Amino acid sequence: MSIEPRATADLVDEIYPDVRSCDLQLQNYGGKIMFAGPVTTVRCFQDNALLKSILSTPGEGAVLVVDGAGSLHTALVGDVIAGLAADNGWSGVIVNGAVRDAAALRTIDVGIKALGTNPRKGTKTGEGERDVEVSFGGVTFTPGDIAYCDEDGIVVVTP
């Protein structure tokens, strides 16, 4: 399902006071700054095999929310995984953790928000959970929610 991106500040003005906005100051790394879509979730710690597997499937405009427990020790997304997301029709990836290949990520047509960068790559054991509620930045992301992202932040709406 494709969702039209919207300015988060305008969206907040419309739905206030029932606002769910992420308090983390995630940075933009992808080629798209404004993106939106239905939420798919994954929880993984310093291991990106599961999220690589998910992003290798058709995204149909969805946003993958990755709870990496805020770890900046290893990157969960780099240019290869971001390329998979773009090639498979994902609108974006929100990472509560680190990314790498920051210069290359800016050239890939997918939204990417993350805490920061680290050139160290993650392990590839496949550990983690998919399609579970994940919480960070004062927001609980539930599969099927709609995430709207832009320069001002992230707003989550339950359809």
From Swiss-Prot:
It comes from the Bacteria. A divalent metal cation binds at residue 101. Its cofactor is a divalent metal cation. Transmembrane segments: none annotated. Keywords: Lyase, Metal-binding. Substrate binds at residues 78-81, 100. GO terms for biological process: regulation of RNA metabolic process. Belongs to the class II aldolase/RraA-like family. Catalyzes the aldol cleavage of 4-hydroxy-4-methyl-2-oxoglutarate (HMG) into 2 molecules of pyruvate. Also contains a secondary oxaloacetate (OAA) decarboxylase activity due to the common pyruvate enolate transition state formed following C-C bond cleavage in the retro-aldol and decarboxylation reactions. It comes from Mycolicibacterium smegmatis (strain ATCC 700084 / mc(2)155) (Mycobacterium smegmatis). The keyword rRNA-binding does not apply. Its EC number is 4.1.3.17, 4.1.1.112. It catalyses: 4-hydroxy-4-methyl-2-oxoglutarate = 2 pyruvate; oxaloacetate + H(+) = pyruvate + CO2. The keyword NAD does not apply. Homotrimer. Divalent metal cation. This is Putative 4-hydroxy-4-methyl-2-oxoglutarate aldolase. SUPFAM superfamilies: RraA-like (SSF89562). One of its GO terms (molecular function) is metal ion binding.
